[in-house]
Curated annotation (Swiss-Prot):
Organism of this sequence: Methylobacillus flagellatus (strain ATCC 51484 / DSM 6875 / VKM B-1610 / KT)
NCBIfam families: dnlj, PRK07956.1
Active-site residues, record numbering mapped to chain: 133 (n6-amp-lysine intermediate)
Protein family per UniProt: Belongs to the NAD-dependent DNA ligase family. LigA subfamily.
Protein name: DNA ligase
Length: 693
């Protein structure tokens, strides 16, 4: 047995080592609680990794000290032969769904509850708890004396499946509860996959040529039902607790809201998007508020849930057909529906990209009737195997362009053929007849016609005139169509040519009276006072968005310096890689583009130029801001411009890396999260003072 260091023959652990190991476990549990529950980590990831490695090394050297609840034991168990059935001690009941998806649904639920309790109008409102209805997989976690002993799916409500081996791989879920734990505590909640995690996972899978997940919900459900926990551990899963099952040896709080607070104190993640309010008005307001911010949430929901807050009233209300009378799910209009893809058309964008567009049998989804959906490009068509005549699932979320997310292949008509975009258009641009090509490194098929192509010309003008570019008010799509179709505007510079664009020529167009024509001329004159970054963005250089345009303007300071820069010089600009650098260099290498720029400047477009300076000298360099609510005297776009002009960055979400949150009136969850994280919060006056320093 010489040299044996592990297993039954390990030497006894030195005195005090067991205490050190347990202290390391407690430290890791605290770090997990701060990161996953409080969303306020106290140490960087590197320190967490260091402590974890130290614990792992000690346990490897002294396996007799390993315990089932150790953080090192989350991953690595053997694969299961099958998922075993589990009978729930307290049934996992489903919740009735309110059929009215408008705010009226809240009033319907309140009326039923009041009737069941025998309340009269003069008896006053009922207190309710309102929370989100997550689109994931319902889960029951059983803790005994503070240790996680079992995790089970809902199944039919009476019997689920044992998935403990997979749940243990989730760092969000504590293997040991914090503080004084009950004898038995069953926690009910939802396993889900956030949208950012879903996108990152699929991007990695595509990069390695592996299968991708269809949607976050399927990803969560499929991951939890894996037989091999090592596979589940590779999936980025999350969990929210929202209720109780069996409890023993625990003083259950008096209200549902207090239950959630108690679960959070025990170390379980609880969603902060919840509220307590009086009466149906509060529920309807919650439904409307969450509906408005639904698409900004990092996870999928399909509605909200209302519960009578007092647990004694819940017991009095009881159940009906295995559904509680004291709760209801109030859904939003569906964001995904099935319909038939009747045809595929193509559109030509300002960069020449020829995009396939699905023409659909009209379907009501996401609150509107949808007849078109983007198919993105040939790669996406191939990946989803989309064909004309297919029954497809269409998704529309908020203002996002509807897209075809999947195909119901069981309903595919006989004789359907794969769709090849280049073949469908005969290898030619459908607008100008120029050759269409697909470069090896690109997903898009492109027209080679440039500004000879009317479609590219129209889109280039609309982009040039857009609010974040030259901001030419009144130059909309219908007017641009006329200007291009009647050959009044062939290049961007023609917009400022008084021989082509004047009162006489404009007033002769459809729906352009003298006043409208004069307003447009005034807007064109006003747009001549520009900024360098807006002008760069307005030129429509491929791969150059607002942020890159600002970086270029800040770095070079002068347009002629930017025009003279080669690919290597351009790559010295922050966040400009070889692809973007090549796009910029190729754009300015074209004599036609340089001529248009000369004419634009000759027409009077100007800005203040500097010699350029490193961004590090900017007063807000390295600072990240988040804007929320309504500011008294300026729009969010104006505030964003001021911050970025001073070298700061503006983000759409609050995190521990946020430097300042600028809050106006009616600030929402971003302000609450900032307060929870202890971040610096400014009003408009505070922001202006900071900018003036």
């Amino acid at each position: 047995m010489t040299g044996m260091q592990h297993g039954l023959f390990s030497p006894p652990a030195p005195a005090g080592l067991a205490e050190k190991v347990e202290a390391l476990r407690a430290t890791i549990r605290r770090y997990d609680y701060e990161y996953y529950v409080l969303n306020a980590p106290s140490v960087p990831d590197s320190e967490y990794d260091r402590v974890f490695r130290e614990l792992k090394a000690l346990e490897d050297a002294h396996p007799e000290l390993v315990t089932p609840d150790s953080p090192t034991q989350r991953v690595g168990g053997a694969a299961m032969a099958e998922l075993m059935p589990v009978r729930h001690h307290v049934p996992m009941l489903s919740i009735e769904t309110e059929t009215d998806t408008t705010p009226q649904g809240a009033y319907n639920f309140d009326a039923r509850v009041r009737k069941k309790l025998g309340l009269l109008p003069e008896d006053g409102p009922i207190e309710y708890a309102a929370e989100l209805k997550f689109d994931g997989l319902a889960m029951s976690l059983r803790y005994e004396h503070g240790l996680l002993v079992q995790a089970a799916t809902r199944g039919d409500g009476e019997v689920g499946e044992d998935v403990t081996h997979n749940i243990r791989t989730m760092r969000q879920i504590p293997l040991q509860l914090h503080g004084e734990a009950p004898e038995v505590l069953e926690v009910r909640g939802e396993v889900y996959m956030s949208r950012p995690d879903f996108e990152r996972y699929n991007a990695r899978q595509r990069e390695h040529g592996k299968p991708t997940l269809v949607n976050p919900r399927n990803g969560a459900a499929g991951s939890i039902r894996q037989l091999d926990p090592r596979l589940a551990a590779q999936r980025p899963l999350s969990f929210f607790a929202y209720g109780l099952g069996e409890t023993k040896g625990w003083q259950v709080p008096l209200t549902h809201a207090q239950v959630l607070d108690a679960l959070k104190a025990l170390g379980l993640p609880v969603c902060n998007e919840r509220a307590v309010g009086m009466g149906a008005e509060a529920l309807a307001a919650f439904h409307q508020a969450i509906s408005a911010k639904r698409d900004q949430l990092p996870y999928d929901i399909d509605g909200v849930v209302y519960k009578v807050n007092r647990l004694d009233l819940q017991r009095e209300l009881g159940f009906r057909s295995r559904e509680p009378n004291w709760a209801v799910a109030h859904k939003f209009p569906a964001q995904e529906e099935m319909t038939v893809l009747e045809h595929i058309d193509v559109q030509v964008g300002r960069t020449g990209a020829i995009t396939p567009v699905a023409r659909l049998k009209p379907v009501f989804v996401g609150g509107v009737t949808v007849t078109n959906a983007t198919l993105h490009n040939q790669d996406e068509i191939d990946r989803k195997d989309v064909r004309i005549g297919d029954t497809v699932v269409v998704r529309r979320a908020g203002d996002v362009i509807p897209e075809v997310v999947s195909v119901i292949k069981e309903r595919r008509p006989a004789g359907s053929q794969p769709y090849i975009l280049l073949d469908a258009i005969g290898g030619l641009c459908p607008v100008c007849g120029s050759h269409a090509v697909r470069l090896p490194e690109e997903a898009a098929v492109r027209c080679t016609g440039g500004l000879f192509c009317a479609a590219q010309r129209k889109q280039a003008i609309l982009h040039f005139a857009s609010r974040r570019a030259m901001d030419i008010e009144g130059l909309g799509e219908k007017l641009v169509d006329q200007l291009v179709d009647q050959n009044m505007v062939e290049t961007l510079a023609d917009l400022y040519d008084p021989g082509k664009i004047n009162l006489e020529t404009l007033s002769g167009l459809d729906r352009m009276a003298m006043k409208s024509a004069q307003n447009l001329l005034d807007a064109l004159q006003k747009s001549k006072q520009a900024t360098l970054n807006r002008f760069i963005y307005a030129l429509g250089i491929r791969n150059v968005g607002e942020a890159t345009a600002k970086d270029l303007a800040r770095h070079f300071g002068r347009l002629d310096a930017l025009q003279a820069a080669d690919v290597d010089t351009l790559q010295q600009v922050p966040d400009v890689g070889p692809v973007v650098a090549r796009s910029i260099a190729e754009f300015f290498a074209e004599e036609h583009n340089r001529e248009v720029i000369r004419k634009l400047r000759d027409a009077g477009i100007h800005w203040s130029e500097t010699d350029g300076q490193p961004a590090s000298s900017s007063k807000l360099e390295g600072k990240t801001f988040v804007l929320t609510g309504t500011l008294p005297t300026m729009s969010r776009d104006e505030a964003k411009e001021k911050i970025e002009a001073a070298g700061g960055k503006v983000s759409g979400s609050v995190s521990k890396k946020t430097s300042y949150v600028v809050a106006g009136s009616d600030a929402g969850s971003k302000l609450a999260k900032a307060q929870e994280l202890g971040l610096a919060i400014l009003d408009e006056e505070g922001l202006l003072s900071l900018l003036a320093e």
